[in-house]
Amino acid sequence: MKEDPRHIRISEFNYPLPDERIAKFPLSVRDQSKLLLYRHGEVSEDRFTSLPEYLPSGSLMIFNNTKVIQARLHFRKETGALIEVFCLEPIQPNDYALNFQQTEHAAWLCMVGNLKKWKEGMLRREMTVKGKSLTLTAERGECHGTSHWINFRWNNPEVTFADILEVFGELPIPPSLNRETQESDKETYQTVYSKIKGSVAAPTAGLHFTPRVLDALRNKGVELEELTLHVGAGTFKPVKSEEIEGHEMHTEYISVSRNTLEKLIVHGGKAVAVGTTSVRTLESLYHIGVTLLNNPEATEEDLHVHQWQPYEMSAKATATSAVEALQAIVAYLDRHSMEALHTSTQIIIAPGYEYKIVKAMVTNFHQPQSTLLLLVSAFVHGDWPKIYNYALAHDFRFLSYGDSSLLIP
């Protein structure tokens, strides 16, 4: 890595974003959004449906197939106080798929809204799920920073926790939309290829893709592969410290199949990433591979990518090629008879970071002074003001439901 970004001042990544430029709702047809093109320093625009024209045949495009869960649960106390319990990540069991299949009991790490009104006792809610009446209770456990361990119990063994979220939960939409969740968000705030439940926010770069765009990409000779990163609520956490050294990145869980890893190797360790979540996962793979090359006996816990890990690598480690790093992960899967890598990442990508795998990215327009803007700036070598000034001057819509960009540095 060339330089340590810890002393970057977040105020250098500010720009004026009028409220009317924030898209509160998506377009009625997903792929009719505008597409800003940044190619080797030049900026132009097109429609998202034209995306395949700008990617060479033989490219490998990687998508995040996570699915947003209806993670917000509302309870009303006997006093009338409304308490919101926002499920962040599974605790018992800590595997997402197993937790969703739990009957009668599940525990999650949650944020609690109106916590001061819930000092003791259990929250209760009567409901009907799949034609069956039941009572759901929520009990507060230990505190973890700004979150709490919450034990959920319900009195019907035929109903899973996934069933309860589906009926009782509300889809969490970004705070920047400044509105209530609507029924239409259940469809529009999911990508058309979402599969694996676990996110509390959508990987929004993927919202523009439709079956016809995906078909056009395949017809162009672009290979499409998937990985999973469950997006946490920390993605909306503002940077409050003057220097980014004071900002703690959230941990997010990732899963990458052997097939996707092998495709990346065939493509020389180069990929087009759809969204910043795919970017963070792909770049984390490089650092996981380097860890395994240095310590082949590393455990699953050892593979977690720490926030500043990329900037603390030796010169020898940074000379490792992407293919060598990916081959080390496949060898790890072979040793453990596994078909997928399951681990977590806390990586922060900021100016000074040297991209190893991602050669082009599709992404929306991000909040001022956000870690996602730092990620984009690192990718385009500091040229982000040119991109954002163009978008502001040419009527692009911003943030989660806004327009798209294809960045090729």
Residue ranges and their predicted role:
Residues 1-409:
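Surface-exposed, charge/polar-rich loops and edge strands
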